[in-house]
């Protein structure tokens, strides 16, 4: 029997049923989910290289026979991925981003082609074979990657398109009573060339399998298109035999009942009093469409999507997408859908001000879109298509422009649109992702435009706008994004000539991927949001991406960790590039997500002082639809981090609730600032009442204002002249040996030693995009210049292996001066460090002057010092920015106040260990020992008013940099306190722009002034 179907470039074959909506029908159905008999073969039977893969005497398709003995097979759950079952018994996952994990030789695949044979029996009721049944269909919602189906030994057909539904007509093969279903699934096929998305390759039947009895007089398909322009319209499309009529449409809440006696009677229905649907007010109406034989239930949302000039409008109002790219991924189940988890995913998005989702890069499980309708999101629904691996071949042979693949690509788009066309949340169709360009993509767009006039078509790779409706880019720099928004810019856009560039500037612009969220970062999110505020053409974007794709794994000794590329011994892989989410694999929100939440909040707050010294609060409602009646403003006043007053305000103005698009200014009660220290006024916008996605009091945004009076200059001890005699070995709570600290507040310590190194972040390791260095990023549209990663530059400069040479240890009056010089082997550059220790009462003053030599041609990761402490130092409280880590280009969500946490809570458990835990703008930090206060360090601003930051860790930055996973960090007998005069920014160069020059740390002289005493 031929196996040519594996390399067939078509969309599938056999008794395939035309694509239709995923409908909630009362027609009889039978779920075939559950335990199936399963075996895994190393290659596909019947292929030239298969050899003796089958047992002696077993023919290629004997597995389909009812007499075949599968009693020795294993049992495997459906839905599932076989590579995630039985601890690797059936192979392991493979992660690639762009690379194909097989030779690029389309449409062929390797002989090593894992093939899973599935068998199960099931009973079909006798009633399904009565005259009231028109057809029996078998539906697969997701199988990776190509599969052949048999029922009772009869070949039914071949399915393709891993994340797309496929139905087969099995009417002739089924019988009353016991039946046998056999499915042969191949991991690799011609279809794999179309599914090169940045994710794990996870074969198997991973979505639902269902048998359906289609009734005589049933409704084959229903599409209720809705519009809203002050009143509502339903434009129905009913696919059914004439004998199915009359057909009735009911919307009980609207008192609507319309009966169509024949297909010719089906016509639009106008509704005067109807509330519109939006992502903020996801108003849905229960509806049904019924014939005598079948009733279909739907939930209708009335909205109109329209592009007017360069504006993308829903219900006549501009949409700003504060979105995320969302893969279907779970640490335990892979792409197997779980409704409770999906609902919590969406609720978490809402809590963090995410209002939009791009379904990267395929349709999700259909129930996910029901939830998006219900909770309220703008959705770009993307087709299951990516051919990114052909980029390495300069797109030669790319299926997007090869006529042999045309039917498969258009079929994929048809099944995408037809399945999900009833969803109010879907406001755009997307042809796919990173598949170059070509005639087949244009054909997909043409089919979509002809089929659905109510939604625009998106595809980022259509740089010139030849066949799509919006201008979309990924990872454009700040200068380039600025030029896209400007009406007076004549700069050529990517892939465009002057005429094409001008045309693209007449369209709505979205960033379909931006602020790549890999590891610690992204930085400078606010720069993009500022441009969205500034230029009407810009409509926001979609963060890459929502969730890390780690797979929960255990070491031989049972230690749990989240695996990424290479952890399963893949031949080729792309490492931890799959760990690039705003939430970690265990759903923990990252500091980057908190930063994003604050920056994109639609309730924007700003505090100012008027001429009389009273605080004014400006509240801007940047929502699409909703007024702010659901928002309460809570203010508080804190003196030196301690709350002294608090109250509430409403967002109502003279004309009632603050409407979408409006702003108002409120005057707060008179606040008396403390004569000494710091007084901070903070205001939070919180939910008045609980919603489907958050409790009452959930914060939406926050702002602060420093009300502190000018403080007298701090009398900082200046370096004194040395005096005769030996340097002291004891100064208050500290003892020294040869100028080095050896005990502090009764505990052994070491340091302080200069630290310029940080464990490189994923962005520090990125080099796919240019570096800014000393160049002005506006000169070349922000592309930067080709350069090694910052991490490589730092290592080449030896910043991770500085050695110390003590030049001088001298006694001071009541103090000690230590002069040292730090440099790396084979480096001509150094850093001079002078420590001045002086005892004043029970306080030990420490002034550290750090001065790099001339000639450093790089940015520094940090400028600071490290203190090695005993391991019983296990936490900290502080007055400064918090409670989460913060960096120069990621400070918007940091609130000045008193914060605290254990050592573990102070750091983020990123999938690949890296720099974490820096807390900015510190006034004081109090370290705990075994949970009790031990040491207090007060940090004073330098001459320019700049305050230091701190971090507390169990491992040195050098140890962290060497560990592939958290569990591979060495056991430590210490805790390490880093006191940083400055830190380098984060950027997003893992896949995006470098650190913006304003936040880059140039080699420069810095000073730390600290006051230390026992707590």
Swiss-Prot record:
- Enumerate the Gene Ontology biological process terms: lactose catabolic process
Q: What pH-related activity note exists for this entry?
A: Optimum pH is 7.2.
Summary of temperature dependence: Optimum temperature is 30 degrees Celsius with o-nitrophenyl-beta-D-galactopyranoside (ONPG) as substrate. Has high specific activity at low temperatures.
Name of one Pfam family that matches: Glyco_hydro_2_N
Task: Mention any one GO cellular component term assigned to this protein in its UniProt record.
Answer: beta-galactosidase complex
List, in alphabetical order, the Gene Ontology terms for molecular function in this entry.
Answer: beta-galactosidase activity; carbohydrate binding
Cofactor(s) needed: Mg(2+); Mn(2+)
Active-site feature positions: 434 (proton donor), 513 (nucleophile)
Instruction: Show the catalytic activity.
Output: Hydrolysis of terminal non-reducing beta-D-galactose residues in beta-D-galactosides
Could you tell me what induces this protein? By growth on lactose.
Which keywords accompany this UniProt record? Glycosidase, Hydrolase, Magnesium, Manganese
The EC designation for this entry is: 3.2.1.23
The record ties this protein, via InterPro entries, to: B-gal_small/dom_5 (IPR004199), Bact_Beta-galactosidase (IPR050347), Beta-gal/glucu_dom_sf (IPR036156), Gal_mutarotase_sf_dom (IPR011013), Galactose-bd-like_sf (IPR008979), GH-type_carb-bd (IPR014718), Glyco_hydro_2 (IPR006101), Glyco_hydro_2_AS (IPR023232)
Top enzyme category: hydrolase
The family assignment reads:
Belongs to the glycosyl hydrolase 2 family.
Protein name, please?
Beta-galactosidase
What species is given as this protein's source? Arthrobacter sp. (strain B7)
- Tell me the name of the encoding gene: lacZ
